[in-house]
């Protein structure tokens, strides 16, 4: 836990990192949706053994999220499994919450492949939502 806090603190204080990842408005920009849908479609072709395979979930007016992803195959889990350190994958998953927080996003997730879920469900909304 102590190392995780050090890593988190380092990211929060890095201005370049903030510029690269953006904020809630840039991440949830509807103009990016067509590109994300294309990425999702192409992921299902499974061109690369250890790549991600995902579905894009659009939040509706009654949902508490704006954008969602269901990952059915995870490159990080695959890499950790191949390298004999699968138990580390669940700790890498925690970084998703750090990154979401840095962008002023609310991330909700109920399961991950790293913790024996059937898929990883990411649901992003604005913290103020």
Name each model feature, range by range:
Residues 115-123:
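Beta-rich nucleic-acid/ligand-interaction surfaces
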Residues 1-82:
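Amphipathic interaction/junction segments at domain boundaries or subunit interfaces
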Residues 55-115:
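Short, hydrophobic/π-rich interface segment
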Residues 124-129:
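Short beta-strand-to-coil "C-cap" segments at the C-terminal boundary of structured domains/repeats
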């Amino acid at each position: 836990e102590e190392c995780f806090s050090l890593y988190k603190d380092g990211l929060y204080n890095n201005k370049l990192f903030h510029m690269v990842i953006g904020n809630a408005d840039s991440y949830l920009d509807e103009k990016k949706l067509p590109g994300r849908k294309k990425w999702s479609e192409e992921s299902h072709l499974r061109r690369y053994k250890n790549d991600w395979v995902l579905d894009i979930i659009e939040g509706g007016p009654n949902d508490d999220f704006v954008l969602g992803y269901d990952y059915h195959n995870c490159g990080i889990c695959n890499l950790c499994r191949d390298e004999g350190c699968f138990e580390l994958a669940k700790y890498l998953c925690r970084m998703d919450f750090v990154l979401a927080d840095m962008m002023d996003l609310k991330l909700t997730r109920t399961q991950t492949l790293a913790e024996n879920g059937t898929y990883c469900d990411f649901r992003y909304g604005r913290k103020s939502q």
